[in-house]
Amino acid sequence: MSDIQTSTVSEDGFACTSQVGDFDLQIDATDETGPNPNAALVATYASCFLPAFRVGGQKTGFDDLGKVQIDADADLDDSDDLERISFDVYVESDLSDDEFAEITELAEDICHVHDALRDELQADVTVVGDAF
C-alpha cells in the first residue's frame, strides 16, 4: 500500500475537490471556488518550509524562534507554468545572518516539498529577524 492516497473529483467545470485523508481540499483552475493549482502548490511549499525552518532552529540550538511568517511570491511564464518562487521569512527572534543562513540551509534539507521541486523552482529565501 502506498504512503499517500488521494481522490480528486470534478463534477463540472474546472473546480476539483480532493479527498486527502479526512480533509477536503478545494482547488479551482479558474480561482472561482478555491485557489488555482499553482497557488496551492506555493502555499503547500510555504506550509512545509515553515515547520522545517523551526526544526532547523531547534537543531542549531534556537528552540524558540517566536512567531514565524512566510510571505511567498511566485512568477509564471507565458504558459502559466511556475517559473520562480521566493520566500520572505519573518522571524520574531533576532539572530545573526549566519545563524539564519544555517537554519535556512537545514530547512531546505528537511522540507519534503523543497526536495520534490526541480532546482530552478526551489525558493529564493530571505530572512528578516526581529520582525515582530
UniProtKB/Swiss-Prot annotation:
Source taxon at top rank: Archaea
Gene3D superfamilies listed in its UniProt record: 3.30.300.20
InterPro entries, per the entry: KH_dom-like_a/b (IPR015946), OsmC/Ohr_fam (IPR003718), OsmC/Ohrsf (IPR036102)
Keywords for this protein: Isopeptide bond, Ubl conjugation
Cross-link (Glycyl lysine isopeptide (Lys-Gly) (interchain with G-Cter in SAMP2)): K59
Residue stretches spanning the membrane: none
Ubl conjugation as UniProt keyword: yes
UniProt cross-references to Pfam families, sorted A to Z: OsmC
Record-stated family: Belongs to the OsmC/Ohr family.
Protein known as: Uncharacterized protein HVO_1289
Protein species of origin: Haloferax volcanii (strain ATCC 29605 / DSM 3757 / JCM 8879 / NBRC 14742 / NCIMB 2012 / VKM B-1768 / DS2)
Lineage of the species this protein comes from: Archaea, Methanobacteriati, Methanobacteriota, Stenosarchaea group, Halobacteria
